[in-house]
Amino acid sequence: MNQDTICAIATAQGGAIGCIRVSGPEAIEITSYIFTPAATNRELGDSKPYTLTFGRIYDGSEVIDEVLVSLFRAPHSYTGENSTEITCHGSAYILQKVLQLLIKNGCRMAAPGEYTQRAFLNGKMDLSQAEAVADLIASSSAATHRLAMSQMRGGFSKELATLRDQLLHFTSLIELELDFSDHEELEFADRSELCQLANNIEKVIARLVNSFNVGNVIKNGVPVAIIGETNAGKSTLLNVLLNEDKAIVSDIHGTTRDIIEDTVNIGGITFRFIDTAGIRETSDTIESLGIERTFQKLDQAEIVLWMIDATNAQAQITQLAGQLLPRCEGKQLILVYNKADLVDNIQNSIPDNFPDNVQSITLSAKKREHIEELQRMLITSAHLPTITQNDVIVTNVRHYEALNNALEAIHRVQEGLTNNISGDFISQDIRECIFHLSDIAGEVTNDMVLQNIFQHFCIG
């Protein structure tokens, strides 16, 4: 248990109501020094857990605010420690004044993520659940919210615990075999049964590893590259999709040189739009670097919006098809015929030599015509599965790397069983697999890794 008591503001600035959280062995006593219940002959320490007490915060004889204080006793609190939460008016002055009074009476300011770190250290959650708290706070779509809730409620942890139990059973059979190797008549499990067990474990770990492809896209946004020649309307479309003037719009060719990225939620899915430099022949060194980055971002995209100026569509398609189509293999490509308001009887057909999965749409980004239709096409093109809170999908790079290491270890186990190698080597690989799975839950994680994880939380 930690021996000091911490405090921090737990709510965002600017609201009508603010909350200060206090946690540690002296949380109730320190709060009592500055808080007087409205009810006479009553102390905060006499309150039952999970109750609210109305009263006033005092600085000496001066009333700072009328507040509500909730009380939690260890181990039945978020951190597993004695805790109080002071709900006051949201004035920045009041919040800072209450913090100063708490610190004056024995608290210290909490470090970023320290409340959740204490919850982890006190066994209230494992490390993967603690990381899910940060993901929940940062969630910006229904899908990211559901995945964070699933992980925070222990869905991922239960999957890992089941795998560890199976691996421990596995290694116990191997080591029993080693302990009684002098008694050839004893057989605890034949190699075919062990192979089947290893195969079952490998399938589960491989499924979790493969789920990262979807999880990473859901968490960070479906990458959508907006490409095309200069002045095709790429920046205008980006501004319309983001509903803000993010990119500079100009009639001058080559205005966009730096890559501009931003995310927006469309239909419960986060899309990460990338406005790129217009592709053209140029002698400008800086513009050439921007075009080079355009192709790099194109390679990273899941969906490609090829902006085509409808007033000169055929020439642009002929000019860029050879450069773009090979790079768009395996991606969702949408031909966006822009500036439809300037052309009569526009042709938005897909050329015969284009792949079958290419889609097309006619719109006017400047006049915001047919933008909703494009948004529907983006949702369909994302090909994301429907996410529920029961789904176990990996979204964290640290988890992905640990699972990859575990998968490599179980592959060595399978190879060892197939080649009938000594149980000593097989047992070692099984234990390595267990180690990597335990690393995800924080059972073997070192202090430097913990510090790196929790320092990315907000204070409070």
Where are these regions (language model features)?
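C-terminal-of-GTPase-core extension/linker across diverse P-loop GTPases
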Residues: 2-9, 145-265, 282-284, 300, ...
